[in-house]
Amino acid sequence: MRNRWIWRFLRPECSGIRWISSPHGRLSPALRRGFLTTTTKSDYDRRPVEITPLEQRKLTFDTHALVQDLETHGFDKGQAQTIVSVLSTLSNVSLDTVYKEMVTKAQQEITIQQLMAHLDSIRKDMVILEKSEFANLRAENEKMKIELDQVKQQLINETSRIRADNRLDINLERSRVTDMFTDQEKQLMEATNEFTKKDMQTKSIISETSNKIDTEIASLKTLMESSKLETIRYLAASVFTCLAIALGFYRFWKEN
């Protein structure tokens, strides 16, 4: 009965204050009102600030009224004061836990100011780094740019030299091919002239041979005509001779 009666004072109806217990040491949303949860990290120089000292913190319930209420419910004054002292200790421990795990708005603003100061320090370090390291990098880049320009100029000169050599080789090869073509054309012209000369000689020989053949054929025709006349004469003489002999025999036979 006493335990139930004690926990009744921890309910929301007591003194109009929302003091709610939650298991495993977790805080209820009513206690988190007005606070912002945060995680504490030591990545920067944080200056811890205590806004409300322990002796100036106010309790969340009226201790005197609670002692009187306990006395009216059968507790003597010493027991009531002991219970209230225990409750005060629990309240202070809970508040310490709350102040350790959460921060107030003022603490948040101070932390933000510290973070901004830390960011300013980082920004200054970045400026210094830019003036030192980036200057070295810029100088190195300029040096590399100069070297690249030199290499580029060397490549241009080498390319120009190779192009000039190739142009000279091409001109020499073109001259050689032109001379070779001229020699071939000259040889072809000589061969053509020789062939024309041989052709004319051949045509002349053929013409002479043809004339000789025509002359021989004409003489043969003349000889054949003369032989034909001689043959006709001989045949005619033979026929007349035979007729004469036949008439002689006929006359001789007729006379006999």
Curated annotation (Swiss-Prot):
Its main location: mitochondrion. This is Coiled-coil domain-containing protein 90B, mitochondrial. The chain crosses the membrane at residues 231-253. Interacts with MCU. Belongs to the CCDC90 family. It holds the Pfam family CCDC90-like. It comes from Rattus norvegicus. It comes from the Eukaryota. Disulfide bonds: none annotated. It is a single-pass membrane protein. InterPro entries: CCDC90-like. Keywords: Coiled coil, Membrane, Mitochondrion, Transit peptide, Transmembrane, Transmembrane helix. Residues 106-164 form a coiled coil. It is found in: Mitochondrion membrane. Residues 1-42 form a transit peptide. One of its GO terms (cellular component) is mitochondrion.
